[in-house]
Amino acid sequence: MSFTPANRAYPYTRLRRNRRDDFSRRLVRENVLTVDDLILPVFVLDGVNQRESIPSMPGVERLSIDQLLIEAEEWVALGIPALALFPVTPLEKKSLDAAEAYNPEGIAQRATRALRERFPELGIITDVALDPFTTHGQDGILDDDGYVLNDVSIDVLVRQALSHAEAGAQVVAPSDMMDGRIGAIREALESAGHTNVRIMAYSAKYASAYYGPFRDAVGSASNLGKGNKATYQMDPANSDEALHEVAADLAEGADMVMVKPGMPYLYIVRRVKDEFRAPTFVYQVSGEYAMHMGAIQNGWLAESVILESLTAFKRAGADGILTYFAKQAAEQLRRGR
């Protein structure tokens, strides 16, 4: 859409007029961030009464399920509509075939049941991916040459997604980037009677260096070692490819799509929203959080940068944001910034 201003010449047009007072700035504000836009990712540990700090993500902790329920009381009271669960798998439960991913008594499955029972109004989004469960840290099953096998991996992902739906997850979020996994998961959910379980597809997930602290948090960094995920996650240099990925996922039955990472990919968010007009989400990933929080803690940036960064996602076209700042943002919004 082109924009051609007509007869808007200074001094008759003074764009600062509407900026003069707070009330007029509020009246003409184009994008508004609310707590309804926020999804809080959380890391869940095995055990009882466990809390572990994550050095690369200051202020974020891994929590056992009992501690998660305690913290969730405050998150729900703040109005945060949904949590995204990421399990921290003990080393002894990791394997080449990622069988723990679909264990009905796995961490994610038990956490989902506990949260749904305590907070039935809270949205629970579960991660469908194999990297927390494999000994090599990749998102799929490997062949003898170390290449991730697409269709074999999908079979495991389907079993994982079904186990999450059976535990009560309202949204499953495949983050693996295997071709065709959305269609396979949708078909399996329909066949099992989970017709209202939504799929939030990590459609445009880039092979990014911004994920480092997350891999520390879930304990997959040491398993992955010097490996990378370039054979299935997207090349950061590509833009058009994101549209092909989103189109495929929507055609296969995704209810929502996601762009990840966030701030370095705002233009991708805009392109996806303009092209498809589908529910579009964005992930302010661990590296983005670590940079912002580090700067805030050192006094280099004001805490107001949290809402500014999240508003940028809304301006780019995002309908919702996964952010480790969800609690702080909700508190700031409640205070009126």
Which role fits each region the language model picked out?
Residues S2-T4, A9, D21, T34-I39, ...:
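Alpha/beta enzyme core
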Residues P11-R14, R29, V35:
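N-terminal intrinsically disordered, cationic/polar leader segments
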Residues R16, R20-S24:
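Acidic, Ser/Thr/Pro-rich intrinsically disordered transcriptional activation regions
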Residues R20, V28-N31:
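N-terminal leader/domain-start detector
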